[in-house]
Regions:
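Nucleotidyltransferase catalytic core that binds NTPs
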Residues: 1-147
């Protein structure tokens, strides 16, 4: 059975993430790798839920086989998660996949991530979960503005 890596901020997690995880789990055993608090602070200025909280929520989702933590995302890419995923699962005879959400295409993801996957024998998959239906940032902005 294939093993699938799915990365993201997941801050906060929402139904769009769950839908993408469900679709990714249909491809194989799903390993989810949430980004660090530091990565979120760089990208968005702050984080809403600390990593430990996000990990606990993700672990409880029925589609998730395991959660990958403590990977280096300081370069702004998922290459650290891809490397750790490969180190953990390369010995299996299973096909390794890197799932990208519905808002990701070969044209708007880091070429480093795609090249890194290919160099390790991991197949990148795009448009997992279909078109983006929600955004964590929009969700939080709407909440802030409703006050």
């Amino acid at each position: 059975m294939p093993i699938v890596l799915f990365t993201g901020g997941f801050d906060p997690i929402h139904s769009g993430h769950i839908n993408a995880m469900e679709q990714a789990s249909n491809l194989g055993k799903l390993i989810v790798a949430p980004n660090s608090d530091e990565w979120l602070a760089k990208k968005k200025g702050s984080f809403f839920q600390p990593l430990e909280e996000r990990v606990n929520i993700i672990r409880s989702i029925k589609y998730v086989y395991d959660v990958l933590t403590n990977w280096d995302d300081s370069d702004g890419t998922a290459c650290g998660a891809i490397t750790k995923f490969h180190e953990l699962y390369e010995r299996s005879d299973d096909l390794l996949l890197f799932a990208n959400g519905g808002d990701r295409t070969p044209n708007n993801v880091s070429t480093f991530e795609i090249e890194h996957c290919i160099s390790l024998g991991i197949m990148p998959i795009f448009n997992v979960g279909g078109a983006k239906t929600q955004s964590s940032s929009t969700f939080l902005n709407d909440w802030k503005n409703a006050k």
